């Protein structure tokens, strides 16, 4: 089970954006995440009239390693580690290590 999923709130633990909070936009297969508003870089975009792309300098989010982020726990307002737990009905859910609450509200 993935510890961090799309649309999770995370806190950056290391790097130039340390301490920032953001939402996960994409989870890549190689263990990297794209987080909203974090690790923004300026890329030079070539114009492409076929795809209706205007050229220029574009600012976009680049992937960050999953080991440099931690899930945000709204109950404690801090970064928290994540574990998994099997419920009585057989479902496997993610839980916060600090207080044992479920990460997903719907379970």
Curated annotation (Swiss-Prot):
NCBIfam families: rplX_bact. The keyword rRNA-binding applies. PANTHER family: MITOCHONDRIAL RIBOSOMAL PROTEIN L24 (PTHR12903). This is Large ribosomal subunit protein uL24. Keywords: Ribonucleoprotein, Ribosomal protein, RNA-binding, rRNA-binding. The keyword Cell wall biogenesis/degradation does not apply. GO terms for cellular component: ribonucleoprotein complex; ribosome. Part of the 50S ribosomal subunit.
């Amino acid at each position: 089970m993935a510890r961090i999923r799309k649309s999770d709130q995370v806190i950056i633990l290391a790097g130039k954006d340390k301490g920032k909070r953001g939402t996960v936009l994409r989870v890549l297969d190689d263990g990297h995440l794209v987080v909203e508003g974090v690790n923004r870089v300026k890329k030079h975009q070539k114009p492409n009239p076929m795809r209706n792309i205007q050229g220029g300098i574009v600012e976009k989010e680049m992937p960050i390693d999953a080991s440099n982020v931690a899930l945000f726990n709204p109950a404690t307002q801090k970064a928290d580690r994540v574990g998994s737990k099997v419920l009585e009905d057989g479902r496997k859910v993610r839980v916060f290590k600090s207080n044992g609450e479920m990460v997903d509200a719907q379970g």
